[in-house]
């Protein structure tokens, strides 16, 4: 544990480098940790505390495949939510979150879902506590100050990082660290679906909780297969750049909703619920039936799904063989398929705004053929992803920020840890 007096000492450079990978970020991370400890002391007094961390994530492969029980490849990144926390003897969890002055207090004898809390941080905390207890684990009181640099709305999964963080605290504080990363992810998903009221797949939570790269197969959606893939981007001399194209998510709900809906309509042509239950051969043999019954866009989206699903497995195979150039080619093909067939790069209801299309075009010009880019996450607005050689990062970042504004391009590393106790 660590107290303020020793906070400079207890946050060693080697620990920070191990977690955050990027040595240039060490002064920033050190300052952030010390400020978090100081904020904790302002709220709760000087104590011996523990520090926990849970990362954001980036989807690497499998664009819009999870809701059809397909496959996904996702990475945990070196942005995270951190908690400075202390165990309490009373049956209350008290949390202050950076940017919100209000203390959230959750009583452990009152963990039922509250409809009025839907969409709030309280709902996520209460949901994680309830499900952890329901699964037979010990829960107890603690107080924590939490700060996060996982950007909200930038497609890096801020809520999943938060849920993973609460689950990780409970695991280490009350269960000797024995709640598995996969179970913590499933607890987080439950909290988000049931208590927070947002239907979501399991990809975000899994990537935040497990760490490194995770390959997830959702064929059995109740018990997804999860495989951790070891991969060091730095060894290959590349960085992961996420650019916020500043496109608004407003009024895009119909566009997002149409994707799973049309894929399900294509699956319904075979009497199935989701496309994960239909083979490539079946889709190709019956394409005219899908076109007639569900329309051409549904047919194209079905073709994207079956090829994107295969691509995820090929990406995993390429990484296992350390064939990085093949991996990059597959990432590029994923992006091309999203643009051409999935069609989630701009909304056809407002063709004068195409932030993501512009970002992809500028990326390809800046990178020439040395790096690759793709839309990731939901699409239509928000962020794009690029794998950029380290020697081109400065050039790429400058070029993208000329178009999208200062700070729009975030240079990330893939971190090997999911939810962890740091100190």
Question: Where are these predicted regions, by residue range?
Answer:
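Structural signature of cysteine-dependent C-C bond-forming condensing enzymes
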Residues: 43, 137-143, 148, 171-172, ...
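Glycine-rich, charge-dense phosphate/pyrophosphate-binding loop(s)
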Residues: 51-57, 61-63, 210-213, 221-224, ...
């Amino acid at each position: 544990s660590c107290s303020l007096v020793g906070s400079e000492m207890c946050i060693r450079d080697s620990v920070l480098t191990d977690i955050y990978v990027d040595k240039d970020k060490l002064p920033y991370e050190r300052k952030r940790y010390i400020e978090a400890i100081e904020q904790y002391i302002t709220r709760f007094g000087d104590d011996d505390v523990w520090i926990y961390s849970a990362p954001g994530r980036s989807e690497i492969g499998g664009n819009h495949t999870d809701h059809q029980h397909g496959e996904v490849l996702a990475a945990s990144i070196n942005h995270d939510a951190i908690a400075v926390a202390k165990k309490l003897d009373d049956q209350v969890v008290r949390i202050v979150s950076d940017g919100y002055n209000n203390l959230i207090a959750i009583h452990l004898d009152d963990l039922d879902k509250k409809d009025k809390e839907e969409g709030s941080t309280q709902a996520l905390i209460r949901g994680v506590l309830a499900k952890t207890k329901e699964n037979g684990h010990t829960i107890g009181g603690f107080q924590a100050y939490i700060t996060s640099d996982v950007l909200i709305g930038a497609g890096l999964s801020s809520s999943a990082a938060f849920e993973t963080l609460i689950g990780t605290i409970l695991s280490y504080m009350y269960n000797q660290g024995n709640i598995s990363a996969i179970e913590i992810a499933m607890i987080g998903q439950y909290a988000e679906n049931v208590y927070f009221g947002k239907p979501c797949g399991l990809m975000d939570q899994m990537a935040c909780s497990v760490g490194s790269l995770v390959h997830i197969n959702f064929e059995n959606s109740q018990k997804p297969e999860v495989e951790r893939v070891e991969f060091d981007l730095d060894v290959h001399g590349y960085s992961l750049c996420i650019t916020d194209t500043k496109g608004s998510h407003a009024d895009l709900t119909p566009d997002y909703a149409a994707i799973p809906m049309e894929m399900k309509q294509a699956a319904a042509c075979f009497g199935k619920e989701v496309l994960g239950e239909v083979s490539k051969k079946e889709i190709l043999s019956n394409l005219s039936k899908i076109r007639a019954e569900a329309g051409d866009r549904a047919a194209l989206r079905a073709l994207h799904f079956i090829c994107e699903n295969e691509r995820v497995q090929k990406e995993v195979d390429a990484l296992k063989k350390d064939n990085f150039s093949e991996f990059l080619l597959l990432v590029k093909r994923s992006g091309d398929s999203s643009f051409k067939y999935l069609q989630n790069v701009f909304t056809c209801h407002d063709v004068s705004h195409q932030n993501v299309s512009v970002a992809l075009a500028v990326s390809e010009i800046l990178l020439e053929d040395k790096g690759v880019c793709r839309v990731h996450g939901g699409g239509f607005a928000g962020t794009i992803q690029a794998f950029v050689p380290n020697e081109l990062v400065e050039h790429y970042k400058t070029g993208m920020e000329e178009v999208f504004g200062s700070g729009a391009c975030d240079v990330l590393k893939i971190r090997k840890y999911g939810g962890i106790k740091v100190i």
